[in-house]
Amino acid sequence: MIRVKREFTVKENALRLDLYLSGNFEVFTRSQIKRRNVEAFKKSNGKFLKIKLSKPVFKDDEILIEFDEESSQIDCLRPSNIPIAIIYEDSNVIVLNKPQGILSHPGISHWDDTVVNFLLYHIKSLKINFNEEKIRPGIVHRLDKDTSGVLICAKNISTLRFLAQQFKDKRTNKVYIAIVKGNFNSFFGSIESFIDRDKHNRKKFSVSKDRGKKALTEYRLLLNFGEYSLLALKPKTGRTHQLRVHMKYLNFPILGDEVYGRVDGSLKKITLMLHSYKLEIDVGKNSFKKFISEFPKRFVIFLSNFYKSDELNLIIDNLVLFLRDF
């Protein structure tokens, strides 16, 4: 048994917090709330203060809950046939083209609509193969909710450990593409820094002189257009929000980044322009494979504001050829 903390924002008014929990999160039935010793805290003036579960909550309230979690919760997860394209699959691994807007694994406010739920639907033996896992069966590495693209998952624990060790040892080649605000003035380069939790907002990360963990990102300019740039990014380390933090630090925030970017009223419909384009990794027995996703549609739509159709098609064809061996 472990003690777990989760934060969420209330989406609608409710007469009681416990009723809101049981009505919105499948894992918190009325009996589960009592059995798991749920305690609740509400943010007030920047601090979380303890409240009773019988208290009413209102839309946009920020709530922190603490509860007991069993060592294995995989049986609580439900399979879900989420539309996710499969790039590659064999008996040990499955490589997905994760859509934007889908979490890699369940969290307090997303229990049935994540990559894990898709894996449980698609791989019937997943629960048996990961019976010692909690709520992340098959997840080797993670993409943020609004980051799309290549995501490799394991079908059994031995493969998960084999793949995860390659990420840990930096023996993979990961290439992302991003559209950033501003014309990039360096053709190629790198940024190395420490990344730590932000002092003022614990949900964010920031570059630090000497605190946190070392992070290294290599970048390559692909295209300057209008007031924007298209970049290829290679994270040589795997820190949370690394690419987004490094681009902000360079003063070229990723377009559509509501956390690290600038608010631009003219671009309200633009979502995060960050895409996991390519992954090279050994899938077993020295079988190194290169997995490439499609050039994302939202990138094409945005670029079409600056180029005619024939010209844009040629540009994308050339980019695809370049990125294949980058």
UniProtKB/Swiss-Prot annotation:
Q: Which Pfam families match?
A: PseudoU_synth_2 (PF00849)
**Similarity-based family:** Belongs to the pseudouridine synthase RluA family.
Keywords, in A-Z order: Cytoplasm, Isomerase, rRNA processing
BP GO annotations: enzyme-directed rRNA pseudouridine synthesis
Recorded protein name is Ribosomal large subunit pseudouridine synthase D
Give the Gene3D superfamilies listed for this entry. Answer: Pseudouridine synthase
Q: Where is the signal peptide?
A: none
Q: PROSITE patterns annotated for this entry?
A: PSI_RLU
Location in the cell: Cytoplasm
What is this protein for, i.e. what is its function?
Answer: Responsible for synthesis of pseudouridine from uracil at positions 1911, 1915 and 1917 in 23S ribosomal RNA.
Name of the top EC class for this enzyme: isomerase
Entry-linked PANTHER family: MITOCHONDRIAL RNA PSEUDOURIDINE SYNTHASE, RIBOSOMAL LARGE SUBUNIT PSEUDOURIDINE SYNTHASE D
